[in-house]
Every structure is written in C-alpha cells, then in structure tokens.
A protein has these predicted regions:
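Charge-biased low-complexity segments
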Residues: 2, 11-140
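Intrinsically disordered, low-complexity protein-interaction/activation regions
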Residues: 6-8
Length: 140
C-alpha cells in the first residue's frame, strides 16, 4: 500500500476518541456517625477472647484491610448505628463499612445481643438512632 493510499484511507475514517472510564464515585455514608449519641448500656460490653479471635480469623481468611499494629497491638473498631423501638428493643442495625462485610455483620449481631436487657430505658428515645462501638484488640 502506498503512502498516498494510506493517507486517503485515514482521511476517510473519522477518528473516534476512546472514552476514558470515569472514576467511580466515592461512597459516602448517609449516616452522620459523629452526631449519633452513644447507645446507653447499663454495663458496657467487652468482646471476649473468642470474639476477638473470630474477627482476626475473618480478617485473614477474607483478605480484609487490617489496621496497622502499634507497638505490637492491633485495634479494630466496628461502629454500628442502632434503631431502638418503643419497647426499648433493637429494631434495626446498620454497620459502618470497614471493607470486611463478615466482620461488619458480626459486629451488628453482637450489638443486638449486647443490648438485650442491657439498656438504660430512661436514656433511650423511642424511634431514636444511636451509635454502638465495639473495639477488638489483639497482639500481633
């Protein structure tokens, strides 16, 4: 093919720009976590060793993002938004995304269990949303 034929062919074919894929939108939580009052426990629950071991195992097994250890200790906080019903029982939970759905759901389930019979009724508003925070702490 001659250069003239190649140039003629190129002129006949319009250049179509390749679309650049748009960056995915940054997911933002519709929950204002800082504005949620803490869930009013009678006795603040602490995760047991077995609970912590489960979280560590799930983080490894699912290749979830892990917090950086500080002086040989690692801490992971799981926040859960909690809706309390008129009977002072948990009606809904929404775990805060930490990049590990198994641990998020586990934390939400623990909050339901920890709240059962362990809330101060005179500090709970019917239909109110609260924040429960669980801290899993272990040695690397």
């Amino acid at each position: 093919m001659t250069l003239l034929a190649l140039l003629t062919l190129m002129q006949a074919m319009p250049l179509v720009p390749v679309p650049v894929p748009a960056a995915p939108p940054i997911a933002r939580s519709p929950i204002d976590w800082a504005a949620l009052p803490p869930l009013p426990y009678r006795r603040t629950p602490q995760p047991t060793t077995a609970m912590v071991n489960f979280v560590v195992t799930e983080l490894r097994r699912n290749e979830c993002p892990r917090p950086m250890p500080v002086k040989g200790r690692t801490q992971l906080q799981v926040d859960v938004a909690v809706l309390i019903g008129e009977d002072d029982l948990v009606r809904a939970t929404i775990p805060r995304a930490i990049g590990c759905p198994t641990v998020e759901q586990y934390g939400a389930g623990l909050v339901v269990s920890f709240a059962r019979g362990n809330l101060m009724p005179h500090f709970v508003n019917e239909g109110g949303w609260y924040r429960a925070s669980l801290r899993f702490d272990w040695t690397e």
